[in-house]
Curated annotation (Swiss-Prot):
Family from the record: Belongs to the claudin family.
The gene coding this protein: CLDN18
Quaternary structure annotation from Swiss-Prot or TrEMBL: Interacts with TJP2/ZO-2. Interacts with TJP1/ZO-1. Interacts with YAP1 (phosphorylated); the interaction sequesters YAP1 away from the nucleus and thereby restricts transcription of YAP1 target genes.
Record's subcellular location: Cell junction, Tight junction; Cell membrane
Residues modified as Phosphoserine: S214
UniProt protein name: Claudin-18
Location of the region described as Required for role in regulation of RANKL-induced osteoclast differentiation in the Swiss-Prot/TrEMBL record: 195-261
Cytoplasmic membrane side: 1-6, 102-122, 196-261
Amino acid sequence: MSTTTCQVVAFLLSILGLAGCIAATGMDMWSTQDLYDNPVTSVFQYEGLWRSCVRQSSGFTECRPYFTILGLPAMLQAVRALMIVGIVLGAIGLLVSIFALKCIRIGSMEDSAKANMTLTSGIMFIVSGLCAIAGVSVFANMLVTNFWMSTANMYTGMGGMVQTVQTRYTFGAALFVGWVAGGLTLIGGVMMCIACRGLAPEETNYKAVSYHASGHSVAYKPGGFKASTGFGSNTKNKKIYDGGARTEDEVQSYPSKHDYV
């Protein structure tokens, strides 16, 4: 998969994940009434992070928001905080990833800058997905605990022969939406981090070459400029060599042992 394709797929997955997180946070069906023991009922109750609703058999639905903050369970407030943090980080990462797309050119932005922005958005998407998954999982754990506690309290008295009427809640649709959305955001963040490696410029290693200056020296004197190139010394040496060398005629003028034969 090319870098551009990986980046675009990660961007689309992150958009879907962020939209799912927003939808799950605003949904009212985080917990729904368990109808296992009473499938036919005139009232159906379900609750969300922000309000609780009651739907009657006639089709009329009445929702009542939570008018208190401090009176809510600590776990519910923690779930709210996790979902909000996940949405904020996902929105910031989405904004950064738009400018980091390789198929979009903004001025003279270098590939190294796009690589850094891609890595930043990928980390934000990963943290956003983890926050969403953690928030939904905490709420699900709270539902499971309350469900079994309510089940135990229903069969009390006379050796468990007397069954009391008590409302139990089970998983709502918002939990599954949140899990899927968090997973999509997490996958998008991982793919963004993978695409960052393709955008990073490759480092080129150059071999060091030693450079030696020429042997010509330049001498500076207060009286003026005089360049000493070394030709004078070479001329003198040449004259000495020429003076010491014998010409061919001079060599032949001296008698040798072969001349007397």
